[in-house]
Design a protein with these regions (language model features):
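Structural detector for short beta-strands of small beta-barrel domains
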Residues: 26-36
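Short aromatic-glycine-enriched beta-strand elements
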Residues: 38-42
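A general sequence property marking short-to-moderate contiguous segments
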Residues: 1-18
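Canonical P-loop GTPase G-domain recognition
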Residues: 164-211
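Helix-rich effector regions associated with P-loop NTPase G domains
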Residues: 3-6, 23-26, 45, 52, ...
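Walker A/P-loop
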Residues: 214
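Phosphate-binding glycine-rich loops and their immediate beta-loop-alpha structural context
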Residues: 120-123, 129-178, 182
């Protein structure tokens, strides 16, 4: 596998694209490094996964800027436009022919009334959730990020910064549902070296503004981004990453993302259940199979709260996320139905106009 994650499966997709194109034309593999209005930056590779920017006039390892012209077969595709992390096929003329099937896809839910999901990135292996423990780590925010990671198909890892001021036992509790939990100083090369040893593939770094994401990314890559200060009054940082960008390390790629102020729940209720695996396990002992863990008799989850085996606040956060997810799903279904109705109405109108046109011709 190359430094960008190119492997034989991506190569097979490109071979199929070349066969479909015909005429002996070559299809270059490329990974979206950044997205701009009307254009993208693409890191091109050859058939072995080695950098191949020279094919389009860029130094190897440097991205090529490509204008976004929607291919005809992508007009109605749900995968268009490309997002950071996408693998694409590029022809010799420098046009994107297609977006290769995504293995994982991370989206951020809307926090407004509209049930919209904002694409973040694709084909990631690990969602690195960065959360400072000073002044206090937000369990709710961590859980929401973990649920988003599960929904995307990637693995959630938690990195706790400024952790020297916290109780180690408390830190492990914060990482329920995460594959890895690490406490470190984002500015310490020695601390980050422990993380680097574990990383491979593509990692996306997420967290609130001021969490230390850019500092961590800088240390991971040995690069320099603009790192903002954190206000002492409220411990909140200035946004230092204004857009998503994929950058390559020695044996992994990193996607840094802007900080978030508020985070909605995913619509994927299974992903939420995976995040709260302890509650899901308890629920199997509830008297009713469809127990809502409210006022039903024989609720094993409520009994666990009463005995102190389960934190009541954790249950409330779970119920709140599930309720939010159901509301979003309902709004999304309603929007889809309205869109389908509008499309059907337009098709009916076109059909009536065509019928009238043909009738007019026949009369003539």
């Amino acid at each position: 596998m190359s430094f960008l994650g190119f492997d034989e499966r991506w190569a097979a997709y490109l071979k199929v694209a070349e066969m479909n194109l015909g005429g002996g034309a070559r299809v270059h593999g490329g990974r979206i490094a950044a997205v701009h209005r009307g254009a993208v930056e693409v890191l091109l590779v050859d058939e072995t996964g080695a950098p191949d920017g020279a094919a389009h006039g860029a130094p190897d390892g440097a991205p090529v800027r490509i204008d976004l012209d929607i291919p005809g077969h992508c007009q109605d595709s749900e995968s268009w436009p490309p997002v950071v992390g996408d693998w694409v096929g590029v022809d010799d003329a420098g046009h994107i022919l297609d977006i290769l099937p995504r293995r994982t896809y991370l989206t951020r839910p809307s926090v407004g009334r509209a049930a919209l999901e904002q694409p973040i990135c694709a084909n990631i292996d690990v969602v690195l959730i960065v959360e400072p423990v000073v002044p206090a780590a937000s369990r709710g925010r961590i859980e929401r990020f973990v649920a988003l990671a599960h929904a995307s198909g990637a693995r959630p890892w938690l990195v706790l910064t400024k952790a020297d001021l916290a109780n180690p036992a408390d830190l492990q509790e914060l990482g329920e549902g995460c594959e890895e939990v690490l406490a470190l100083d984002a500015r310490s090369a020695a601390d980050v070296a422990r993380l680097v040893e574990l990383l491979s593939g593509t990692v996306v770094v997420v967290g609130r503004s001021g969490a230390g994401k850019s500092t961590l990314t800088n240390t991971l890559l040995g690069a320099t981004q603009t790192v903002g200060t954190v206000r002492e009054s409220d411990h909140k940082g200035r946004h230092t990453t204004t857009g998503r960008q994929l950058v390559c390390g020695e044996h992994f790629a990193v996607i840094d993302t802007p900080g978030v102020r508020a985070l909605g729940a995913t619509m994927d209720t299974e992903a939420i259940a995976d995040t709260f695996a302890d509650i899901r396990a308890l629920a199997t002992s509830c008297h009713f199979a469809n127990c809502s863990h409210g006022s039903e008799p024989g609720c094993a989850v409520r009994d666990a709260c009463a005995s102190g085996a389960l934190d009541a606040d954790r249950l409330e956060r779970y119920l709140r996320m599930m309720a939010e997810a159901e509301r979003l799903r309902s709004r999304s279904n309603a929007r889809t139905a309205r869109s389908q109705d509008r499309h059907a109405s337009k098709e009916n109108t076109r059909g009536r106009r065509e019928t009238m046109r043909l009738k007019g011709k026949n009369r003539g």
